[in-house]
């Protein structure tokens, strides 16, 4: 048996075990991390040589879900895992975002961390343990790393914080908060919550930070026993003479180029100055060094202006929002639409309503099987005025869409209140920063324009950070793209007037203090109120009527014991209803039936068929049915779908009938009255009493009738 090093802790009432040396022994570092019965294999491999031609940290984090982990066989034709699920992509981003700032920016050797979920107890989410596992392998390895970090999930139920809640506990929780932090600072926050007040959210972040300390202690213990000596950090310095020459050439001109509020004018001015600079110095210095020094001058100008003058290079105040505009109903035919503009950032959001059958089917390790609300974020190249390849959404697009989706879920009506599947598409048509929060604003308005009865409007804002010497800092409201690029933090907050619905915090520094967190959260609240006022002017309440082009949903209830009658053998009956009426039909286990149709006539037709299928035949009632079979002694008539009765030959007419065929033939529609339902549930019918209301029906025992030829069919003597 292979000997492994094992380390244990009890976290949140469940055992956490990190083991190294048993699997993936050829990787630079590898651990298995198990929490309760959820287990992951986390590996790190580093290239031996720097990657040529890159000016960034080449870190790749892959999060892979194995379906066997939950005892599943993958769907699809080939029955094996394919491209990562949306949840796997988000889990990979959850790991990448806090670790990247803690690795040296100068590192050019490719790093690959692969997180593989190899066991899932379907109770505990594996994502945060991917973060802890990745931090552990970096801590053990030779790679320079300013961790370790801990990652904790926090729920809030019945006035108490819950550490690492299960899927079942999260369903009852008011928040789903993930915090990643080092010993002293927070490096990543992600939250979805049901309008949580700002002060409570800050307390929850503090609670998670404290819980992370034990995970950091555990990794320090592992490093002490298994850690390798760290490699030196590469030095990538721009020669001093280049920096001096560039600074002298652009002195005073950088601020002038950056002063334009219009993004296009600003970029043109910056590029024009860059061209002059390169032309003037290219014969003396390397172009790469010139461009790097110029980039530092731009960064210095942006940051120093904010820190020293409390104003931005384009003249906007520290807490001043860009020009806002909101408009709804901008497109014909669609079910709902809106356009939200903030400066040069514009997002068009479209709402499409469908039946509950159109909910997304999830094939992964998450607790959910279906999703009735989807928000898809698209970022086209033209939104930044660039020429780029346009293809399927990448990790960034999926992450931004998930954030906006999470922000809106708390205000959505339940399926019982609004039995629709809702698809949102947020198309970014102009980008100068904070498009994800623009997507929240435009999508909120689009939902209301579509007539979705959302509880409240939701708005989002991004708060930036510029840090200086001696722990000085400045938080700035509504950051533009250039401030995001040269700043230290992107603190996104979405919510209503009554609280926070989503947070996502990414940063370039090695963590932020609780003073920064507090300032950012309350600064976002102030800005959110201003944005909501602008949105209210466009549309303050959801429309009371759906678009004429949206499907209508009609809800009825049937006896749960009759569900089988509606579905039919192998779904034959329900498929027939859908085809006949051009509707959608969704049936819940409690007998709730939702019919979706583009017009009321089709819906009512489907409703009638379903009601007839589930209706009990009553003695004395009159029905119009179709003759299905003819015997020598009478005719069988289907009076309700799947329910036949017999009209004896003596009850076919108000005169003597010699042959049944003289009065009716198969396919004829006749009106009959139920005269009797015998002890075996067989239905006796009379046409004679319809033709002659004064006639008295004859009670008869069908067992005394002549035996007919032909095979026995159960429906000949039953309700079915």
Swiss-Prot record:
InterPro entries reported for this sequence: ExoRNase_PH_dom1, ExoRNase_PH_dom2, ExoRNase_PH_dom2_sf, KH_dom, KH_dom_type_1, KH_dom_type_1_sf, NA-bd_OB-fold, PNPase
Any GO BP annotation: RNA processing
Region annotation (Disordered) ranges: 697-720
The EC code for this enzyme is 2.7.7.8
**Which superkingdom?**
Bacteria
Keywords annotated in UniProt: Cytoplasm, Magnesium, Metal-binding, Nucleotidyltransferase, RNA-binding, Transferase
Q: Which cofactor does it need?
A: Mg(2+)
- Disulfide linkages recorded for this protein, renumbered to the chain, are none
Q: Does the keyword Magnesium apply?
A: yes
> Is the keyword Magnesium in the record?
yes
Q: Where does Mg(2+) bind?
A: 484, 490
Q: Where is the KH domain?
A: 551-610
Annotated Gene Ontology MF terms? 3'-5'-RNA exonuclease activity; magnesium ion binding; polyribonucleotide nucleotidyltransferase activity; RNA binding
Q: Which PROSITE patterns does the protein's record reference?
A: KH_TYPE_1 (PS50084), S1 (PS50126)
Annotated function: Involved in mRNA degradation. Catalyzes the phosphorolysis of single-stranded polyribonucleotides processively in the 3'- to 5'-direction.
* Official protein name in the record: Polyribonucleotide nucleotidyltransferase
């Amino acid at each position: 048996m292979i000997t492994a090093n094992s380390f244990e802790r009890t976290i949140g009432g469940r055992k956490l075990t990190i083991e190294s040396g048993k699997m993936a022994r050829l990787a630079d570092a590898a651990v298995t991390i198990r929490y309760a019965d959820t287990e992951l294999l986390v590996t790190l491999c580093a290239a031996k040589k720097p990657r040529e031609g890159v000016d960034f940290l080449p870190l790749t984090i892959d999060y892979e879900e194995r379906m066997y982990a939950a005892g599943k066989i993958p769907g699809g034709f080939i029955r094996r895992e394919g491209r990562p699920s949306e949840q796997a992509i988000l889990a990979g981003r959850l790991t990448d975002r806090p670790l990247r700032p803690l690795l040296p920016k100068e590192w050019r050797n490719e790093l690959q961390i692969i997180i593989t979920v190899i066991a899932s107890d379907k109770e505990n989410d594996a994502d945060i343990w991917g973060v802890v596992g990745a931090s552990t392998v970096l801590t053990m390895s030779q790679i320079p790393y300013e961790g370790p970090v801990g990652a904790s999930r926090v729920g809030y139920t019945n006035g108490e914080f819950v550490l690492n809640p299960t899927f079942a506990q999260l369903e009852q929780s008011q928040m789903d908060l993930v915090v990643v932090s080092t010993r002293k600072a927070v490096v990543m926050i992600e939250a979805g919550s049901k309008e949580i007040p700002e002060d409570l959210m800050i307390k929850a972040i503090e609670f998670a930070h404290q819980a992370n300390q034990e995970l950091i202690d555990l990794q320090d213990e592992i490093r002490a026993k298994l850690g390798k000596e760290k490699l030196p950090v590469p030095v990538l310095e721009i020669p001093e003479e280049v920096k001096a020459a560039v600074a002298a050439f652009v002195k005073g001109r950088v601020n002038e180029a950056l002063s334009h509020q219009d993004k296009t004018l600003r970029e043109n001015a910056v590029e024009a100055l860059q061209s002059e600079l390169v032309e003037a110095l290219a014969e003396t210095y390397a172009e790469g060094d010139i461009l790097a020094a110029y980039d530092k001058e731009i960064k210095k100008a942006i940051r120093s202006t904010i820190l020293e003058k409390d104003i931005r290079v384009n003249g906007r105040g520290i807490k001043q929002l860009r020009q806002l505009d909101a408009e709804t109903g901008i497109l014909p035919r669609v079910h709902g639409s809106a356009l939200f503009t903030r400066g040069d950032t514009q997002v068009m959001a479209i709402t499409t309503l469908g039946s509950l059958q159109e909910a997304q089917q999830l094939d992964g390790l998450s607790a959910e099987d279906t999703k009735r609300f989807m928000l898809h974020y698209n970022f086209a190249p033209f939104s930044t005025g660039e020429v780029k390849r346009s293809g399927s959404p990448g990790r960034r697009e999926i992450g931004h869409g998930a954030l906006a989706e999470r922000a809106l879920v708390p205000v959505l009506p339940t399926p019982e209140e609004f039995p629709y599947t809702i698809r949102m598409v947020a198309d970014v048509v102009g980008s100068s920063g904070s498009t994800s929060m623009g997507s929240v604003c435009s999508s909120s308005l689009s939902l209301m324009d579509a007539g979705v009865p959302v509880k409240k409007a939701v708005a989002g804002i991004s708060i930036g950070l510029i840090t200086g010497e001696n722990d000085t800092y400045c938080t700035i409201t509504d950051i533009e793209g250039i401030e995001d690029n040269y700043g230290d933090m992107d603190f996104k907050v979405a919510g209503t007037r009554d609280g926070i619905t989503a947070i996502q915090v990414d940063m370039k520094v090695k963590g932020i203090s609780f003073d920064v967190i507090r300032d950012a959260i309350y600064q976002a609240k102030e800005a959110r109120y201003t944005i909501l006022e602008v949105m209210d002017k466009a549309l303050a309440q959801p429309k009371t009527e759906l678009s004429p082009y949206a499907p209508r949903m009609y809800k009825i209830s049937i006896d749960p014991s009759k569900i089988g009658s509606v579905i039919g053998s192998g779904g034959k009956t329900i498929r027939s209803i859908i085809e006949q009426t051009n509707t959608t039909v969704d049936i819940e286990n409690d007998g709730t039936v939702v019919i979706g149709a583009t017009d009321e006539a089709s819906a009512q037709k489907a409703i009638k068929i379903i009601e007839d299928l589930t209706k009990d035949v009553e003695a004395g009632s009159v029905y119009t049915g179709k003759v299905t079979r003819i015997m020598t002694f009478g005719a069988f008539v289907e009076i309700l779908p799947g329910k036949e009765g017999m009209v004896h030959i003596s009850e076919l007419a108000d005169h003597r009938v010699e042959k049944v065929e003289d009065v009716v033939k198969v396919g004829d529609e006749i009106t009959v009255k139920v005269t009797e339902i015998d002890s075996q549930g067989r239905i006796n019918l009379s046409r004679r009493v319809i033709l002659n209301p004064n006639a008295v029906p004859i009670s008869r025992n069908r067992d005394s009738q002549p035996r007919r030829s032909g095979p026995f069919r159960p429906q000949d003597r039953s309700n079915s």
